[in-house]
């Protein structure tokens, strides 16, 4: 197993159909990642896949290349109706469904297949209009897919390829009954190409694979290095009093090019967002109750570099590929050890290095033993000098739940706060 992100194997060597290869190369991909090099040859021979790989290792392109190649080499049923897609790709979140769709666009164009999206929270009529015209590939979340299915807008009787992405997250969010409902309305497993991908493959996920797939090949990439060799991990033990000031101080010292800060609650995220915004950072807030259009706009701005910091709950921790994230902060240690791996997996992607900083505060330090047991290593501890923390921070204009000590020198100044070195703002 190569220690580098890319292998010496190129997509051109795999035997992909020319149209698929053109779509892959249109996205700038030439050499395969390990998960791509191991799974695509199996998919081209019709093997079912249950694949495990760290986030950011290219599993989306792996299953998309396998899917489009299968469509080109296998004819649709002669009895297939307009409302019957040939492919169903299921994702746990709206954001991931949209991301998969966007990643698939070059291949859909080069191969000549139509795609549709189905996810809740936004765009019902627009999605409906596309589906009524007929699609080859349907990508979406289970709830909206079932909604269209029960209305007769779509029918799954002609499905030839099914993909389940982030399967462990499906369990976490309680979607497994929905998934089984959809599987029962498809042709039997032996008549489909089936793929299941996840950053972790627990026993329950493997049981799901064997229940609804045809002798799946279990592919596991770098299981021993769960948190990524390119991620520098660091742990602080701040008091609740120092916690916000420590975050602001570290942000001031490092000026991350692109950072994601995770908190465990919506209110916690709102507080962190307010303090960073008051301190002059270009920061976005992503929590579960942010409207869908605004969520997508925030992600687009963060990806494009219009925002430097994203404060989020775990809604953004799984599946999303945001390139060039230099820092991840666990402002709160997560309650679920798997979420720690998924959170810090936002950085150190595509062969780049990353920095993951975690706070074991008075409220969440008890989560640390489970995290270190799950990752099979202790997180290196760093100390800080409380007297060296920032002492002239700008108070947010709105009232927030997190109060800094009254002896700190907070000034309610009208300036835009600190600015990134190099005159970036």
UniProtKB/Swiss-Prot annotation:
SUPFAM superfamilies: P-loop containing nucleoside triphosphate hydrolases. PROSITE patterns: DEAD_ATP_HELICASE, HELICASE_ATP_BIND_1, HELICASE_CTER, Q_MOTIF. GO terms for molecular function: ATP binding; ATP hydrolysis activity; RNA binding; RNA helicase activity. InterPro entries: DEAD/DEAH_box_helicase_dom, DEAD_box_RNA_helicase, Helicase_ATP-bd, Helicase_C-like, P-loop_NTPase, RNA-helicase_DEAD-box_CS, RNA_helicase_ATP-dep_RhlB, RNA_helicase_DEAD_Q_motif. GO terms for biological process: RNA catabolic process. Residues 40-219 form the Helicase ATP-binding domain. Residues 416-425 have a biased composition (Basic residues). Gene3D superfamilies: P-loop containing nucleotide triphosphate hydrolases. It catalyses: ATP + H2O = ADP + phosphate + H(+). Keywords: ATP-binding, Cytoplasm, Helicase, Hydrolase, Nucleotide-binding, RNA-binding. Coiled coil: none annotated. Pfam families: DEAD, Helicase_C. Residues 405-425 are annotated as: Disordered. A motif (DEAD box) lies at residues 165-168. It is an enzyme of class 3 (hydrolase). It is found in: Cytoplasm. ATP binds at residues 53-60. Residues 243-390 form the Helicase C-terminal domain. A motif (Q motif) lies at residues 9-37. DEAD-box RNA helicase involved in RNA degradation. Has RNA-dependent ATPase activity and unwinds double-stranded RNA. Component of the RNA degradosome, which is a multiprotein complex involved in RNA processing and mRNA degradation. This is ATP-dependent RNA helicase RhlB. It comes from Tolumonas auensis (strain DSM 9187 / NBRC 110442 / TA 4).
